Amino acid sequence: MSTLEPEKRRQHEDKSNEIIDSPIFLNKISALPESENVHCLLLKQLIGSPQLKQTWQFNFCVDLNFLLENMHASVFPTVDVRITHGYDSKSDSLARLTAQMNHCPVNVKLYSVYVPMWGTHHSKIMVNFFKDDSCQIVIHTANLVEPDWIGMSQAIFKTPLLYPKANDSLSTSSVPEYGNPSKIRKHEGSLDIKDDRNCDIIDVDSAFENFKHKSDTRSSDDLGVIGRQFQQDFLAYLKNYRHTYELIEKLKMYDFSAIRAIFIGSVPGKFEGEEESSWGLGKLKKILKMLEKDSKKDEKTKFEESDICISQCSSMGSFGPKQEYIAELTDGFGCQRGNWKFLFPTVKEVQQSMLGWQSGSSIHFNILGKTAASQVETLKKGKNLCKWVAMKAGRQRVAPHIKTYMRFSNDGELLRWVLVTSANLSKPAWGTLEGHKAKSRSTRGLRIRSYEAGVLLYPKLFEESQRAPCIMTPTYKTNTPNLDEKRREFYGKRVIGVRMCWDFPPVEYEDKDEIWSPVINRTDKDWLGYVWPPNW
């Protein structure tokens, strides 16, 4: 949804354009200048409202003390905190988290999740409920630990505030006027909405955007189909837990029609037949194929063979003895091997990052693995492997924990689609096909081992009847697209920004560049004066 001031939006419309700010946010890094933190978010802006009533946190690593530090102290006596973590039941990490829970001043429930071998509970999701009965879903890339939020690059997608459907009520208590859906509908077109929460948490302009949708010539059923599909897919994901019945029943009562995103999730299991395209790489492949087919109807927006697909993440698994998984991945991403680039930091980029070698503890690749060296060599020879370059994005020294997958036009001006997700480049996260070979004894299906969550965005999601056609473009150091002279061809269109955390075009590894792997000791000190691993 657009976060532009109404006056600013009108100015752009006078130029026959409509601008929509990036639905993707980056995390705010306090050590960076303000010019590189424009539109960036703190964890406190997501869970720090004095109106927070209940929060469901789904994550891998959790520091409960850090979580509470980012909540408003006034909610401690009443807030209900539910945490689904990724720790093994016998791990020291879970023991520490349990000890924190036993000594904290808040009502906290912890939930463990079974995952098969090689799998993890890796999703990063928040479902926040507020005292006015509003709700917000946040899908992001950060663990709930301080280093992830203060020193690593992360991405955040947050839905608009969601409210109960007109015929549903979550409580019999009086609801403030700004939180009552029926009251909001009576004020269509008005921006005089009051809210006693932090203005950083609530975008009044989101309400403005919703009012605009209500006045569109299409029926509300047409406008809400994307959001209802998101709701259906998100609830299907939640059904894979044993402890989320209460949450599912609650979310069924909410109106998701304002959401413009596709939920892409992974859950453990082997998925056969139609279910193969319900999760992970199978679902992404199905949607992207439909997108590419649909794009051929419009010469100005169709996918081109020269397009560049980019995968960027903070962990790389094994691609197999002959790197056969690369073919599965590129097929899923809908691109040719020669047009696929993979961004992963070098040793030098980790060493010079804001947290120094410590950043590398969150960036995983086992170079000592049986086929790891040949895998890197294959990626280099294919000109697929690229460095972490983020000068234009303002994140060069903020090492990546973010995971992004995108398809660019060759000149980098247009984005065909964007995926922000917790999923790294691995078989457990995305899934791998079983039983598809001629002599295979097992049935065909997609095998996934981890829990992952992400959102897919593409221009058509933002289209509305009797409005300009939509295009999507990268933005740097801001969420707002910049229509300068070189983008005059954008005039007359609805332009959606996508906040970039790294630079286009990607820069390939040189022969001297060494891929980062935390299993290798480093005697060279980082800029903070530490070796790796540190002697703490």
Swiss-Prot record:
SUPFAM superfamilies: Phospholipase D/nuclease (SSF56024). The keyword Iron does not apply. The active site is at residues 122, 401. It is found in: Nucleus. GO terms for cellular component: nucleus. Its main location: nucleus. Signal peptide: none annotated. It comes from the Eukaryota. Gene3D superfamilies: Endonuclease Chain A. DNA repair enzyme that can remove a variety of covalent adducts from DNA through hydrolysis of a 3'-phosphodiester bond, giving rise to DNA with a free 3' phosphate. Catalyzes the hydrolysis of dead-end complexes between DNA and the topoisomerase I active site tyrosine residue. Hydrolyzes 3'-phosphoglycolates on protruding 3' ends on DNA double-strand breaks due to DNA damage by radiation and free radicals. Acts on blunt-ended double-strand DNA breaks and on single-stranded DNA. Belongs to the tyrosyl-DNA phosphodiesterase family. GO terms for biological process: base-excision repair; DNA repair; DNA topological change. InterPro entries: Tdp1 (IPR010347). One of its GO terms (molecular function) is 3'-tyrosyl-DNA phosphodiesterase activity. Its EC number is 3.1.4.-. Residues 315-318 are annotated as: Interaction with DNA. The record marks 426 as: Interaction with DNA. This is Probable tyrosyl-DNA phosphodiesterase. Keywords: DNA damage, DNA repair, Exonuclease, Hydrolase, Nuclease, Nucleus, Repeat. Substrate binds at residues 124, 403. The keyword DNA damage applies.
